[in-house]
């Protein structure tokens, strides 16, 4: 039990460091932790960079707004690492995942935020510009797979009015 208390104190200190960065670095660090701890599957490096760059409700994704993975890791104070072999991001240890799961207050509306982010991406001009056909080219659409597969899963866990509006916008038959 003592080791668990030591780890809890360590994680609280590290999270305090992330928040103490203030401003954009604190926002990015906490957003990365939210995405990794609440995603429905491990995220690829490019997926998390895109997810963090999306502004909910925006129709455009500016490539200049997409952070580098090194910038995101820097904001996380050593709590996140990249598995080089499979190019996914993960928390440094399973006990940190357990810690985050037992502290849901750290991430206000995590699943609704994630659903809104996925739906914003799917409703964006970037995703709509994808031409469907026999030679479907997904390069440059690095968040498409995750957002199209998991927006509903996040929405089922935690529904928000905004997510519902974005889902109805996506499914609007008049736009197809």
Model segments located where?
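Leucine/isoleucine-rich amphipathic helices and adjacent mixed helix/strand linkers
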Residues: 1-176
């Amino acid at each position: 039990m003592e080791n668990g208390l030591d780890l809890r104190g360590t994680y609280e200190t590290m999270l305090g460091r992330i928040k103490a960065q203030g401003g954009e670095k604190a926002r990015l660090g906490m957003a990365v932790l939210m995405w990794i701890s609440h995603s429905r599957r491990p995220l690829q490096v490019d997926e998390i960079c895109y997810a963090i760059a999306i502004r909910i409700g925006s129709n455009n994704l500016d490539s200049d707004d997409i952070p580098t993975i090194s910038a995101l890791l820097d904001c996380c104070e050593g709590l996140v690492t990249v598995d080089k072999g499979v190019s996914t991001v993960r928390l440094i240890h399973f006990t940190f995942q357990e810690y985050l799961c037992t502290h849901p207050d750290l991430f206000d509306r995590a699943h609704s935020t994630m659903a809104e982010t996925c739906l914003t991406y799917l409703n964006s001009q970037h995703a709509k510009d994808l031409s469907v056909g026999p030679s479907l080219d997904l390069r440059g659409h690095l968040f498409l797979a995750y957002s199209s597969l998991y927006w509903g899963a996040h929405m089922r866990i935690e529904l928000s009015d905004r997510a519902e509006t974005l889902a109805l916008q996506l499914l609007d038959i008049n736009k197809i």
